[in-house]
Amino acid sequence: MRKVTLTLSAIALALSLNGAAMAKVHMPEVVSQGVTVTELAHQQPIKWVSVAEIEKSLEGQAPMAVGFDIDDTFWFSSPGFYRVKLEYSPNDFSYLKNPEFWEKMNNEWDKFSMPKQVGIDLVQMHLKRGDTVYFITGRTQTKTETCVTKYVQEGLNIPA
């Protein structure tokens, strides 16, 4: 009797392991199928545009508000960030969460940032058109800020 019980138990166990258990999980709709390496290799060529082409495309349009990022877009600020990173956390990016870093960057080390010529040209084109230019930054706000506004204004030739 014992052998029969063990045999039936073994058969029942084997049969129960045969089926896959499926949890009922909500699956969202597929939004994007993604791309393959082949598709990436066949991308369309990039069309670079000049400030003159942008200006021409805006002819006849009413003045508009435009916004531009500051750091490493219009403003080559990597040297200042690099200098302060070495001081606060040379081996990681924890310096970005350190208020002392931002005080130093926004008040001292931004003087090592440089405007990019294309940024100067683009801002001047928009100002000439009568557009309102806004600058956007992801920088952490500090108690004081003596460099950023001053150097962006001076570097991009923005009238006071």
From Swiss-Prot:
Q: Does the keyword Lyase apply?
A: no
Asked if Metal-binding is a keyword of the record, the answer is: yes
UniProt keywords, alphabetically: Hydrolase, Magnesium, Metal-binding, Periplasm, Signal
- According to its UniProt record, the EC number is 3.1.3.2
Disulfide connectivity for this sequence is none
Q: Where does substrate bind?
A: 137-138
GO MF, one annotated term = acid phosphatase activity
Q: Where does Mg(2+) bind?
A: 69, 71
User: Where do the catalytic residues lie?
Assistant: 69, 71
Give the reactions, separated by semicolons, that this protein catalyses.
Answer: a phosphate monoester + H2O = an alcohol + phosphate
The UniProt note on the cofactor reads as follows: Binds 1 Mg(2+) ion per subunit.
Q: Which SUPFAM superfamilies match?
A: HAD-like
- Kindly give the Pfam families that the UniProt entry links to this protein: Acid_phosphat_B (PF03767)
Taken from the UniProt entry, a GO cellular component term is:
outer membrane-bounded periplasmic space
Where is this protein found? Periplasm
Q: What class of enzyme is it?
A: hydrolase
**Leader sequence residues:** 1-23
Q: Which family does it belong to?
A: Belongs to the class B bacterial acid phosphatase family.
Its biological function? Answer: Dephosphorylates several organic phosphate monoesters. Also has a phosphotransferase activity catalyzing the transfer of low-energy phosphate groups from organic phosphate monoesters to free hydroxyl groups of various organic compounds.
Q: What is this protein called?
A: Class B acid phosphatase
Q: Which gene encodes it?
A: aphA
